[in-house]
């Protein structure tokens, strides 16, 4: 297993390009199954989950054509099997997203129950109940979800999500795109990635309205056609590199991104003392060599502060002036990185869903282990400011969400290298 070795102390300075958003790319790839002709999706990040999704299509008999810029063309008409097998699904939760499109377009689907990150209990029952509301017959047996559309196809339905679910909203929205009649999704997720998926469905000739609000209305259409689409930038990658600049007292400009999808994070960075300038597709952060000030924050569904940026701000607070409280309201077990940061000398107390972080002047390099995707990013940030060397093990977690993290950080002046395990 690869490891990262980071020598702390370099002040980051420079410019980098932000990759496409994995959490938009995965549902958009799944939605290509709805089309009745070839679809091209561009700006895909080069990440394991994306390759797994493309491999899953290959397993179903679709042969995606990929160019060197990681643009992929998918022709769903060549599908041969409607089964998403366990060995691919187990490594990636998002494969549940093929369930809705397959039932809507082909009338049936068999999808293994998913695997993925070890955070909290992420149930798939909302996906199942939503499809049942549209008339699908569903059985869960032998670790597989087996779904069949009724005679004449799925029917539009009113569906209320009793908890806000991003993948649940996406799955039902995709199924509704080809259902007969109107579907109304209430208490829907409002994330920008949901909006990106809705824009993609509409680019294929769909009729989705209200994405980005908690009520989404979908008028089903007879067919969805070929389209060319570019995936939105990754707001979490954007935020992570901005925090990297902030913790090191540096200056970083991130390009090919969108400041409007990151407002809660930018506000907190300003509160921490950063100077921030933005353009249409870039953000520049300058700390002028200052140590950040500690901030209090509470994670909540979009447009509030994102849970996927929580760990990075614990790293910021760990070396900041003062004490900050971080309250996690989305996932349980999301402070696993704290115990690794203790090894580096961080002063963090966890009480239930709250982490109280008292900033120290300096962290010390130590061997640490990544436990999940965003936690691993926080260890990288802490290592950038720690005295001496930090060895981060199990970095396959990082590779699931960050494209070429060591190369991008090297471009900003970080002393970081990957070593084979």
Swiss-Prot record:
Q: Which residues carry this modification: 2-(S-cysteinyl)pyruvic acid O-phosphothioketal?
A: 117
The family line of this record is:
Belongs to the EPSP synthase family. MurA subfamily.
Q: Please list the reactions this protein catalyses.
A: phosphoenolpyruvate + UDP-N-acetyl-alpha-D-glucosamine = UDP-N-acetyl-3-O-(1-carboxyvinyl)-alpha-D-glucosamine + phosphate
Q: What is its main location?
A: cytoplasm
Q: What are the binding positions for UDP-N-acetyl-alpha-D-glucosamine in this chain?
A: 93, 122-126, 308, 330
Q: Name one Pfam family in it.
A: EPSP_synthase
> Which biological pathway?
Cell wall biogenesis; peptidoglycan biosynthesis
Gene Ontology terms: cellular component? cytoplasm
What is the organism field in this record?
Answer: Pseudomonas putida (strain GB-1)
- Please explain the role this protein plays, according to its UniProt record: Cell wall formation. Adds enolpyruvyl to UDP-N-acetylglucosamine.
Q: What are the UniProt keywords, alphabetically?
A: Cell cycle, Cell division, Cell shape, Cell wall biogenesis/degradation, Cytoplasm, Peptidoglycan synthesis, Pyruvate, Transferase
The protein in question is named UDP-N-acetylglucosamine 1-carboxyvinyltransferase
Record-linked InterPro entries: Enolpyruvate_Tfrase_dom (IPR001986), Enolpyruvate_Tfrase_sf (IPR036968), MurA_subfamily (IPR050068), RNA3'P_cycl/enolpyr_Trfase_a/b (IPR013792), UDP_GlcNAc_COvinyl_MurA (IPR005750)
Q: Which GO terms describe its biological process?
A: cell division; cell wall organization; peptidoglycan biosynthetic process; regulation of cell shape; UDP-N-acetylgalactosamine biosynthetic process
Checking PANTHER family in the record gives:
UDP-N-ACETYLGLUCOSAMINE 1-CARBOXYVINYLTRANSFERASE
Q: Which GO terms describe its molecular function?
A: UDP-N-acetylglucosamine 1-carboxyvinyltransferase activity
Where is this protein found?
Cytoplasm
Catalytic residues at 117
